[in-house]
Regions:
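Short alpha-helical segments that sit at the start of domains
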Residues: 1-27, 32, 92
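Short, cationic-aromatic polyanion-contact patches
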Residues: 18, 77-98
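Short helix-capping/hinge SLiMs at alpha-helix to coil transitions
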Residues: 29-35, 48-50
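Short acidic, hydrophobic short linear motifs in intrinsically disordered regions
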Residues: 35-45
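Short helix-coil junctions and helix-kink-helix linkers
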Residues: 43-56
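Basic amphipathic alpha-helical segments that dock to polyanions
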Residues: 59-69
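A short, conserved structural fragment
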Residues: 67-77
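Amphipathic alpha-helical dimerization/coiled-coil segments
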Residues: 94-124
C-alpha cells in the first residue's frame, strides 16, 4: 500500500479503502492499543485469512504506510535480533473513518468544487 487512499465503490465499510489483510492488521492494532510488533500482526493476519497467506513484508509495508500517514504510531525498540517497530493506533477506528471521509471529500472539493457541493446537497 502506498501513502494514498483508494476508494473501491464496489465495496462497503472499511473494505472500500482496505483490502483483506490491511483490514485485519488495523483491527488487530485497534484491539491492542498498547501496540504490536509486525510479527504478531502478521501471525494474526495469516490466522484470520483462513487458507490464504500474506508475506511479512506486505504487512510491514502496510504498517509503515499507515505510520507515515499518521494513522499509526510507531516506536522503534532494540531487542534480540536487532531493531523492530511496535505499532499502536494514532487514530481510533471512528477517527480513521472520519480521516478517510475528510480526505476523499477534500480531494473531491479540490478537483470538482461545484459538482461536489451539488452532490453533497443532493445526498443530504
Amino acid at each position: 500500500m502506498s501513502n494514498r487512499i483508494e476508494f473501491d465503490t464496489a465495496e462497503t465499510g472499511l473494505r472500500a479503502v482496505l483490502k483483506d489483510y490491511p483490514e485485519i492488521a488495523m483491527k488487530a492494532i485497534w484491539e491492542s492499543p498498547e501496540g504490536l510488533g509486525s510479527k504478531v500482526v502478521w501471525d494474526k493476519a495469516n490466522e484470520r485469512l483462513k487458507g490464504k497467506t500474506i508475506s511479512r513484508a506486505s504487512i510491514i509495508n502496510f504498517l509503515e504506510a499507515m505510520r507515515e500517514m499518521g494513522v499509526l504510531k510507531g516506536v522503534e525498540i532494540t531487542g534480540k535480533g536487532g531493531h523492530r517497530w511496535i505499532y499502536s493506533p494514532a487514530m481510533t477506528e471512528p477517527q480513521f473513518k472520519t480521516f478517510i471521509a475528510e480526505t476523499i471529500l477534500g480531494n473531491l472539493k479540490r478537483d470538482f468544487p461545484e459538482e461536489t457541493r451539488r452532490a453533497i446537497a443532493n445526498v443530504s
